[in-house]
């Protein structure tokens, strides 16, 4: 037979299925055989190429070897067909060509395999099963045979859908996402078969098949049926397969379009949600089952209870029967398996009984009795029906079956009851636990409410006390103002009366006064006591602390007028008076005449009595101070001037004093215990041979004690001239003008004083003023008297007429009194070398007695009082002078408020995993994670109160404006309820104190100490550069980072120096680390931080700061009096270390080094690195954990 050339193109495409079929019928068997021979060679070669491309491109057409045949496991990537599925068995003709080619590529394609028989059988079966051809009238047996041969030819030796172009197009579509693609029919040389054509091929007039909406399985089955019926040629099968693939690809692409692209996190979230829903559904099913079981159990229990109530046997009998059954089963445990098998034993017995009954049919009654006995003895039936109904068993078989059922029911019933009892017990325990938890929560809530109510009540009470205190202060201020106005009015009247009386009496008593003044100015001081007895008694009465309150105000005013006009000559002084007294510096106001002496008081027996201490300006009665060396003697040149002046003054005094003597005769009897009078500075300075009487604050023989001066009182005091005094000693210049102007007429009538006497008086007054300025008590309380000085000045005596009316209007009390401000609590203290301090508050006395010894108080009174005052202010005692907040803002700009510093965000939404890690005096510290940055930060929570508001604002402002690598970074601050949350940088290494607490086991070497000092100095240099002071440098405020970073923290006590206020004097900080100038209350600057750094350096070297073994008050006293103790084992430390300490701990602030200069010290060159320092931190942390573990083990034992 002549071979036809190989066809390179498929059959031409037609539009109608009938045309295709007619073209198909024209082919004969011969043509088919020729076509088969022509296609064998090329197909095998092309199949090899295809197989190579499949290996290279990793096609989705995978094959599985079943016996000697290989079949693909799937057709396309989007529509897999598993070989194990039942549908895959129907598709063997479709993929038969592929399996054959893969097989023939190995066997050169020259022989048929066993698969040919299989497909022949399939085709023959299909032809035999379809005797009537579906293609129409032209079909016959020959066409059926030719169709079978064609299918054998085309399906066995050629691939159904796989070609090189198919693989290329499939691969391109796989990597071109979401792009439409179809397999065009032109590539196969055929035409596309529509749904109408397929339906017409099937010959069905029913509804057309919907490819788009049908499933893959339906389309596959439809295609297989058509192939099995022989309705497709090669082109049609390819087109149909392409159609099926395109439909599935379109569905997949449409699904991808509806489903947006997602990343891995979203995919995980979706999967988690899907699993959660699945678990929820499963839990719901389980829950429903449990509910159903619960309802069933309840119903069963209800039925059992009703059944028990109807039972004829009692509960005791039932329990007895159950107990017998349990005992019997325990006895049989030795021969029985570990689990009970009651039914098996009963069956065996029953079988034996059945055999006996079969053998002995005549003895039925005996067997029945035996069965009954076995039932009673072995089973102990608790079936209540047998007892209630008393059933008589007639047949042995029925009795055996009943026994088996009863035994099984009894066992199940017991197990069910036991399980029910356990469940009830579990539920009861669960309910009790829930009730306990609810009760605990209610109790906690009630306690929390009670605590909040208590705190609220305490705050309200504090506010009420504050309001009452302010109200009392207002009332006191009002009363005081009224009294001052009344006293000023009386003083004006007395001055007017005294001036009138002086003019009337000056002309009548001039001669007699001249003689009296001459005798009073003698150097020996031997004047007649009788001539001055009456005025002396009057002044003694006025100076007495015991009787001053009993004198009528009008009489006192009259006596003041008489005394201002003139005074009798001074009495002779006793020889035992100490000449070393310097208490004249405490004398009252200056007299009308510069050299007028004070008059001593003489009792009825003619004995000199010292004047009360309250007379000379002291704040307390009965207090004493150590005396001073005697004053230098003055030349006798001014004696004549003194005599002349005394003549003129005493001229007017005798007349006025005679009038007042009769009014106070009754009061003079009580003045016998008066003390020695005081002498004014003018007397002491202008009398060459006069002796200076002892101070009203006592004359002592102690020479070592320093001279102290009594601080002034705020209430009114009567001076030696009779005028009232409302101010402190520093007001004498103002008072001097008043008294001098009131007596100017009398002094001018006698010719005045000589110029030399005036000059000497001025020189001596300036000396006394310098002494007062240097006085300890003035220095201590001078700042608290500034406002009082300006308000207590008395008006001049020469004012009259309209001037008096204007002053009245100015002094008139307004109907509304404003809120008091700058309220002070002055403490008036005196020192006696014999008795110690006098006039101290009770708290101060307790502090001194409990912390100081008597010799220390005598030797260092100023230091003791300094330390006590500092401690009182630091501890906030009630009687301590108030610490006034600085009125200067932190900067020259307007002051910052809390609203300017806080953020309005909710910190609970920003931070999570908030865990407490510590607490202190200022508040609690928490560790949290910032959700925005995913960084660990620290949160400091503080209660907002009026007392700490300024401190909080100061700390936040300082941290916010400080950006340095050695200062803890500030993040933000928030207000949550009544708390302030300050978010800052988290330092995982803790504070330096935690390392120093392990000093016994871990000591820092010099390089590590130098590293800490270097980092701290860098931070101090930064804040000092911006004129800020930290004022609380200590180990607790030095924080350590994860890599050994050192940073400053806690700026609550920090201060900002300004152009106006370049120094500070407020008492803040921690006592053991405070500089001496800060303890004494002197002005200080940046150098206090350097001192604190030196103390902290010693703390790192010795494990604790100096004097830590003493109480704070004692430590402060030792620091101010004895200085710092020498460092322990000084020889172990290098010369540079000791020099660095000396520069830091220099008492003289001028010589003390600054932070910038210390950064260049040679000691800091030995500093180690941060990681090396952190080794010590890590070792201290491990040591602390070990200690805690050991302690926990001990407590557990």
UniProtKB/Swiss-Prot annotation:
Effect ascribed to mutating residue 585 to D: Constitutively active
Residues carrying Phosphothreonine: 585
InterPro entries tied to this protein: CRIB_dom (IPR000095), CRIB_dom_sf (IPR036936), Kinase-like_dom_sf (IPR011009), PAK_BD (IPR033923), Prot_kinase_dom (IPR000719), STE20_Ser/Thr_kinase (IPR050285)
Location of region: Disordered: 1-96, 328-383, 430-468, 485-543, 562-819
Pfam families xref list: PBD (PF00786), Pkinase (PF00069)
Main location: cytoplasm
Top-rank lineage group of the source organism: Eukaryota
Reaction catalysis annotation: L-seryl-[protein] + ATP = O-phospho-L-seryl-[protein] + ADP + H(+); L-threonyl-[protein] + ATP = O-phospho-L-threonyl-[protein] + ADP + H(+)
Keywords from the UniProt entry: ATP-binding, Chemotaxis, Cytoplasm, Cytoskeleton, Kinase, Magnesium, Metal-binding, Nucleotide-binding, Phosphoprotein, Serine/threonine-protein kinase, Transferase
Tissue expression per record: Colocalizes with myosin II to the cleavage furrow of cells undergoing cytokinesis and the posterior cortex of polarized cells.
All copies of domain Protein kinase, residue ranges: 911-1164
Domain CRIB: 817-830
EC number: 2.7.11.1
Coiled coil ranges: none
Active site per the UniProt annotation: 1032 (proton acceptor)
Low complexity: compositionally biased ranges: 80-94, 346-381, 494-523, 636-653, 671-707, 739-756
Ranges of biased composition (kind: Polar residues): 34-49, 70-79, 524-536, 593-615, 718-727
PANTHER family per UniProt: SERINE/THREONINE-PROTEIN KINASE TAO (PTHR48015), SERINE_THREONINE-PROTEIN KINASE PAKA (PTHR48015:SF3)
Name by which UniProt lists this protein: Serine/threonine-protein kinase pakA
């Amino acid at each position: 037979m002549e071979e036809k050339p190989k066809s390179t193109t498929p059959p031409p495409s037609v539009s109608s299925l009938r045309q295709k079929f007619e073209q198909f019928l024209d082919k004969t068997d011969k043509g088919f055989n020729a076509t088969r021979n022509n296609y064998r060679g090329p197909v095998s070669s092309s199949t090899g190429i295809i197989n190579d491309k499949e290996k290279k491109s990793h096609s989705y057409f995978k094959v599985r070897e079943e016996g000697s045949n290989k079949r693909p496991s799937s057709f396309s990537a989007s529509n897999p067909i598993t070989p194990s599925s039942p549908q895959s068995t129907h598709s063997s003709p479709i993929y038969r060509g592929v399996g054959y080619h893969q097989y023939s590529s190995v066997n050169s394609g020259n022989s048929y395999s066993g698969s040919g028989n299989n497909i022949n059988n399939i085709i023959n079966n299909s032809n035999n099963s379809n005797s009537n051809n579906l293609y129409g009238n032209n079909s016959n047996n020959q066409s059926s045979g030719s169709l079978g041969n064609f299918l054998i030819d085309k399906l066995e030796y050629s691939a159904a859908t796989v070609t090189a172009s198919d693989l290329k197009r499939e691969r391109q579509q796989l990597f071109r996402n979401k792009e439409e693609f179809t397999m065009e029919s032109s590539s196969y040389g055929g035409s596309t078969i529509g749904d109408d054509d397929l339906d017409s091929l099937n010959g069905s007039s029913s509804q057309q098949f919907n490819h788009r909406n049908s499933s893959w399985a339906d389309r596959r089955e439809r295609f297989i049926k058509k192939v099995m019926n022989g309705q497709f040629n090669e082109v049609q099968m390819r087109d149909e397969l392409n159609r099926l693939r395109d439909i599935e690809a379109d569905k997949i692409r449409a699904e991808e379009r509806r489903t947006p692209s997602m990343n891995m996190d979203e995919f995980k979230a979706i999967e988690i949600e899907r699993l959660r829903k699945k678990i929820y559904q499963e839990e719901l099913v389980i829950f429903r089952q449990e509910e159903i079981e619960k309802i069933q159990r309840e119903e069963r229990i209800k039925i059992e209870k009703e059944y028990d109530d109807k039972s004829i046997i009692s509960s005791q009998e039932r329990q007895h029967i159950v107990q017998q059954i349990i005992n019997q089963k325990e006895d049989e445990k030795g021969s029985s398996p570990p689990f009970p098998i009651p039914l098996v034993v009963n069956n065996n017995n029953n079988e034996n009984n059945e055999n006996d009954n079969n053998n002995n049919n005549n003895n039925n009654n005996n067997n029945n009795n035996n069965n009954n006995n076995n039932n009673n003895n072995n089973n102990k039936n608790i079936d209540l029906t047998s007892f209630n109904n008393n059933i008589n068993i007639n047949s042995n078989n029925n009795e055996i079956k009943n026994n088996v059922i009863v035994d099984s029911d009894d066992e199940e019933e017991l197990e069910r009851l036991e399980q029910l009892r356990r469940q009830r017990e579990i539920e009861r325990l669960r309910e009790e636990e829930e009730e306990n938890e609810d009760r605990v929560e209610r109790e906690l809530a009630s306690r929390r409410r009670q605590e909040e109510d208590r705190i609220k009540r305490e705050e309200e009470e504090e506010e009420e006390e504050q309001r009452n205190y302010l109200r009392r202060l207002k009332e006191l201020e009002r009363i005081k103002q009224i009294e001052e106005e009344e006293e000023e009015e009386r003083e004006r009247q007395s001055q007017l009366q005294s001036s009138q009386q002086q003019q009337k009496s000056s002309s009548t008593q001039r001669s007699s006064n001249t003689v009296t003044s001459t005798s009073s100015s003698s150097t020996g001081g031997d004047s007649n006591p009788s001539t001055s007895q009456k005025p002396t008694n009057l002044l003694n009465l006025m100076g007495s602390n015991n009787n001053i309150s009993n004198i009528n105000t009008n009489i006192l005013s009259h006596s003041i007028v008489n005394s201002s006009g003139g005074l009798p000559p001074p009495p002779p002084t006793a020889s035992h008076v100490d000449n070393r007294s310097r208490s004249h510096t405490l004398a009252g106001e200056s007299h009308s005449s510069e050299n007028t002496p004070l008059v001593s008081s003489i009792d009825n027996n003619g004995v000199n009595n010292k004047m009360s201490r309250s007379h000379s300006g002291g704040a307390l009665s009965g207090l004493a101070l150590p005396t001073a060396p005697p004053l230098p003697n003055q030349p006798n040149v001014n004696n004549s001037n003194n005599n002349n002046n005394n003549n003129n003054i005493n001229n007017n005094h005798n007349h006025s004093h005679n009038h007042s003597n009769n009014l106070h005769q009754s009061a003079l009897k009580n003045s016998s215990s008066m003390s020695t009078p005081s002498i004014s500075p003018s007397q002491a300075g202008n009398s060459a041979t006069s002796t200076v009487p002892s101070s009203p604050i006592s004359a002592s023989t102690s020479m070592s004690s320093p001279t102290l001066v009594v601080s002034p009182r705020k209430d009114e005091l009567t001076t030696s001239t009779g005028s009232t005094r409302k101010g402190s000693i520093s007001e004498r210049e103002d008072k001097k003008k008043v008294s001098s102007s009131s007596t100017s007429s009398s002094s001018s009538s006698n010719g005045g004083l000589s110029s030399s006497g005036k000059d000497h008086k001025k020189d001596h007054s300036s000396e006394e003023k310098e002494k007062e300025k240097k006085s300890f008590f003035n220095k201590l309380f001078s700042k608290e008297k500034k406002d009082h000085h300006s308000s207590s000045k008395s008006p001049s005596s020469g004012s009259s007429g309209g001037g008096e009316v204007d002053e009245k209007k100015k002094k008139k009390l307004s109907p509304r009194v404003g809120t008091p401000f700058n309220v002070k609590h002055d403490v008036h203290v005196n020192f006696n070398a014999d008795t110690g301090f006098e006039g101290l508050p009770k708290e101060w006395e307790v502090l001194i007695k409990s912390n100081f010894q008597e010799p220390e108080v005598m030797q260092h009174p100023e230091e003791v009082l300094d330390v006590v005052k500092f401690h009182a202010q630091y501890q906030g005692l009630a009687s301590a002078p108030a610490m006034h907040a600085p009125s200067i803002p932190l900067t020259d700009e307007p002051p910052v408020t809390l609203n300017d510093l806080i953020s309005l965000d909710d910190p609970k939404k920003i931070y999570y995993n908030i865990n407490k890690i510590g607490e202190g005096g200022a508040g609690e510290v928490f560790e949290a994670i910032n959700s925005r940055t995913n960084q660990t930060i620290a949160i400091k929570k503080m209660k907002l109160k009026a007392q700490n508001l300024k401190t909080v604002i100061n700390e936040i402002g300082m941290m916010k404006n400080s950006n340095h690598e050695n200062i803890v970074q500030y993040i933000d601050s928030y207000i949550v309820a009544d708390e302030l949350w300050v978010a800052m940088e988290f330092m995982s290494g803790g504070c330096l104190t935690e390392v120093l607490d392990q000093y016994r086991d871990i000591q820092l070497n010099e390089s590590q100490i130098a590293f800490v000092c270097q980092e701290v100095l860098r931070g101090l240099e930064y804040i000092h550069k911006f004129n800020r002071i930290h004022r609380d440098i200590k180990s607790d405020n030095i924080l350590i980072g994860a890599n050994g970073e050192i940073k400053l923290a806690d700026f609550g006590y920090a201060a900002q120096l300004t152009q106006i206020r370049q120094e500070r004097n407020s008492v803040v900080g921690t006592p053991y680390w405070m500089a001496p100038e800060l303890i004494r209350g002197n002005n200080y600057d940046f150098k206090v931080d350097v001192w604190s750094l030196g103390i902290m350096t010693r703390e790192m070297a010795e494990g604790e700061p100096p004097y830590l073994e003493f109480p704070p008050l004692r430590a402060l006293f030792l620091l101010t009096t004895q200085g710092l103790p020498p460092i322990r084992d000084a020889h172990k430390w290098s010369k540079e270390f000791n020099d660095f300490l000396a520069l830091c701990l220099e008492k003289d602030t001028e010589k003390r080094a600054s932070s910038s200069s210390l950064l260049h010290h040679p000691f800091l060159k030995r500093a180690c690195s941060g990681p090396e320092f952190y080794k010590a931190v890590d070792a201290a942390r491990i040591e602390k954990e070990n200690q805690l573990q050991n302690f926990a083990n001990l407590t557990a034992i």
